[in-house]
């Protein structure tokens, strides 16, 4: 009777251990998904231009489509005897891994009095922007990339 109880007890512990391991693997699979991607976004840009003595010469604006990084990355905090805080942190952020320069033309230009500029020379403004070409999960605070 005592041996049967011991065998049943061992089988029960073994079954609980298997369920625990399976549950942890399932949780790891669910939280292991990263979703960091490059998406299109519409933004409104306004740029002021000043003369040599600092007076407003013209203001130009426009709505343009640009790329942006959006999504989430895996991060974790776990107990650590090596760390002074008692925890080891690994944080990752969805950021640009490569930027490209792009020339944009703003078509709505106004002088300092708010009058729309129509001539070819002042009616448009060329500006340069930098936008992400590729996004990925990068260690948070790492500005080298």
Swiss-Prot record:
Entry keyword set: Disulfide bond, Hormone, Secreted, Signal
Disulphide bridges: 36-94, 60-109, 69-135, 73-137, 91-140
Keyword Signal included in the entry's annotation: yes
Start and end residues of each CTCK domain: 36-131
Top-level lineage group: Eukaryota
The protein's role, per its UniProt record: Final heterodimeric neurohormone released at the end of the molting cycle, involved in the sclerotization (tanning) of the insect cuticle, melanization and wing spreading.
UniProt name for this protein: Partner of bursicon
Organism (species): Apis mellifera
Lineage summary: Eukaryota, Metazoa, Ecdysozoa, Arthropoda, Hexapoda
């Amino acid at each position: 009777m005592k041996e049967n109880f011991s065998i049943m007890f061992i089988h029960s512990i073994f079954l609980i251990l298997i369920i625990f391991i399976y549950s942890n693997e399932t949780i790891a699979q669910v939280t292991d998904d990263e979703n960091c991607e490059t998406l299109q976004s519409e933004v409104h840009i306004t740029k002021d231009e000043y003369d040599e003595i600092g007076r407003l010469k013209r203001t130009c604006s426009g709505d343009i489509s640009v790329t942006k990084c959006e999504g989430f990355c895996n991060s974790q905090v776990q107990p650590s005897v090596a760390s002074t805080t008692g925890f080891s942190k690994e944080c990752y952020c969805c950021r640009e891994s490569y930027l490209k320069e792009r020339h944009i033309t703003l078509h709505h230009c106004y002088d300092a009095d708010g009058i729309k500029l129509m001539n070819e020379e002042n009616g448009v403004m060329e500006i340069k922007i930098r936008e992400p070409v590729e996004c990925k999960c990068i260690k948070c605070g790492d500005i080298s990339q």
